[in-house]
């Protein structure tokens, strides 16, 4: 994650959490959780303000957060009541394995090379048959937005590169959706993998 991206989230953490915590993620939750065992362990990668962590915890899952923004880590932990690790995604080295990863609108802040590196190294921390959900913006250009946040767009080519690094994984669900915060020109591709 670039310094300007991290600076944005640290400097706008409260505002960002308040805005994103009101998004209706019910369809995404439903599609994801049908693949996760009841009470299973989930890591929310890029947990932001803690919206998804809180939902998972409130529905009986063992939820843990991960975020690179120190300010968002504090907010997410307080809001959700879940443990949150503050770490760069690529530096994260947990001491156990998990049933599922949830990376909603977070990996897109990495370069394509680092996204592929994340998949090739961090899926080792999923239990056998583990589930990996991720979503990324479509139809955008790679680079910084007006706020200095770096984005990598979703593409079919990127997905194929991810799959090539994980030859035994399978796509179990995939869908295209409009923005949950009603931003008119923003669309998302969501993918669920069984690793």
Predicted regions and their residues:
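Class I (Rossmann-like) S-adenosyl-L-methionine-dependent methyltransferase catalytic domain
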Residues: 1-96, 113-117, 121, 131-195
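Conserved acidic residues
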Residues: 99
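A conserved beta-strand element that flanks and buttresses the S-adenosyl-L-methionine
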Residues: 102
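Short catalytic micro-motifs in class I SAM-dependent methyltransferases
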Residues: 105-109
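Helix-to-beta-strand junctions that scaffold the AdoMet/dcAdoMet cofactor pocket
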Residues: 110-111, 126-127
């Amino acid at each position: 994650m670039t310094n300007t991206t991290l600076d944005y989230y640290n400097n706008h953490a409260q505002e960002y959490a308040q805005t994103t915590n009101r998004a209706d993620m019910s369809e995404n939750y439903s599609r994801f959780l049908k693949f996760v065992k009841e009470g299973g362990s989930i890591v929310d990668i890029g947990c932001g303000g803690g919206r998804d962590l809180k939902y998972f915890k409130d529905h009986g899952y063992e939820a843990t957060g991960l975020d690179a923004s120190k300010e968002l880590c504090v907010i997410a932990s307080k809001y959700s009541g879940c443990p949150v690790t503050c770490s760069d995604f690529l530096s994260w080295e947990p001491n156990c394995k998990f049933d599922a990863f949830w990376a909603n609108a977070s990996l897109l802040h990495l370069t394509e090379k680092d996204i592929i590196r994340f998949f090739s190294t961090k899926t080792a921390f999923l239990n056998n048959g583990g589930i990996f959900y991720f979503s990324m913006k479509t139809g955008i250009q790679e680079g910084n937005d007006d706020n200095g946040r770096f984005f990598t767009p979703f593409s079919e080519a990127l997905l194929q590169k991810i799959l090539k690094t994980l030859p035994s994984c399978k796509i179990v669900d995939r869908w295209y959706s409009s923005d949950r915060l009603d931003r008119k020109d923003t669309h998302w591709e969501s993918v669920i993998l069984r690793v």
